Structures are given as C-alpha cells and as structure tokens.
UniProtKB/Swiss-Prot annotation:
PANTHER family: HISTONE-LYSINE N-METHYLTRANSFERASE SMYD (PTHR12197). This is Putative SET domain-containing protein L678. Pfam families: SET (PF00856). SUPFAM superfamilies: SET domain (SSF82199). Residues 235-255 are annotated as: Disordered. It comes from Acanthamoeba polyphaga mimivirus.
Amino acid sequence: MWKDNRISEVFIKKKGIGMIALADIPANTLIMKELPISIVKINNQTVSDIFQILYDVLSDPNKKSLFEKFLPNSINEFESHRNNLMKEFHKLKKSRLNNVYQFINNNFTSDEILLYGAKYMCNAFEFNNGSAILINGAKFNHSCVPNVIFVSDENYMYFYTVRNIKTGEELTDNYVDIMSNTKTRKNRLFNQYGFDCQCERCIGSDKLFYQEVEKIQSSKFYFSNQISVNHRKKLQQNSKNLKKNPKKTIKATPK
C-alpha cells in the first residue's frame, strides 16, 4: 500500500474514522494505491460473494484482526438484513461451498455472522467484476459530491483527487451511484450502510450540483481509461521482454 504523506487518518466527530488533508493537494493527484486483502470475482460460477470473502478473511488470523476493526460494531441497524443473509448462508450447505458453510457455522453465532455481514456490506468495494476488501480505502467517508474517486486495474485500487483540496479538508469518496437522485441515494445509504446522509447535496438540491457531479464522473472515466492503457502497455512490454529472454519469467505488475 502506498499513501501520499499529505493525507492522514483521523477521528471525525459524528462520523468516526475518516481521512483528511494535512496540506493543500492539487486536483487529479494520486493520493493512495492499495492492494486488497481479499477479492472475489462475480460470474456465473459465483455461489455467494459475501460468504466467499468472509471465509477468506475469517479463516486468516491476520485478515480477521484487520477486518474486525471495521464499523459497525453493533447489529442494531442491520436486523432487517438477518433473514436474507441467513437464508443465503444456509444455501451454502448444499452447494460446492459446503466447506465455507461448515467453517462459519462451527465457529460463529448467528449474531456474529450478521455483524460480519454488516461489516462486509458497509466496507466492500466493487472491484473489476467482483468485490474486494481494502483496509485503508474503507476509511474514506461518503459524500454525494466526493472530492476523491477510486478506480482499479487487475491488482490495485487507485484513489485520485478530483478537485483542489485545502489543508484540513476531509477527503471523501462515494458509496453509491452519485448520478442517481437524492431519494434513491439516501434510501440505499440508509438500508445498506445504516446512516442518513446529510452531505451538502442531500440537504440542498441536486440541480445545484449537476455540473460538478458530471465532472466527477468524467474524471473517473478518464482515470479508469488511463490505468487500463498503462496496464496494457506494461503487459505488452513484458511480452516483448519474454520474447527476448524466454528463460526469464517476468511478472506483470501495474505501474
């Protein structure tokens, strides 16, 4: 994991852990690059992305220790998810993931399973065609007008500023689709993440932020495209090197 020394993790009143700028940071700056601790690809072979990741994390003591620090620490706001979550969990018993079912069922209570499920729902990232857990990326709080966007390649998640950031300003990304309307965003945030969004856009008007949101989406598309281009160039260069030195194995890594 690489992090710009101008950003820092702090405690923010009414929010908990968050990220702030220790100095002015220009727009379009890469401020963090992180390798997920767990990834699952979602395709027609996927049985349950949530429990596949939970198994990977909870069966590894080091990953489990990091994951348990995530919020929430209580299941009070997530009781409405219990039935659906446990229904999905019990389906594993008769699937090819029976080993996942047996491990979780033998080691954790239903309340613990719900809590770990809530931690997943509140902290997992979409990652290519799947889901991922990032320890530091999860520390950014949400805004419907974020000043940070995140994009991924095959291995890493990259975090960029989308406008000039002032010293002391909180750095935020988005948990839901910022192109959706206020009602849709607030419902999704409350149902999945357990909070009522009070960002400047949610207490104001979507119309006032339309151009800014469009610009943020354009920035995300631009950086995603740039990372894809750089990754392809890296792979092409490695392929050329392999042809020149066929006995030498070169591992493709993102720039």
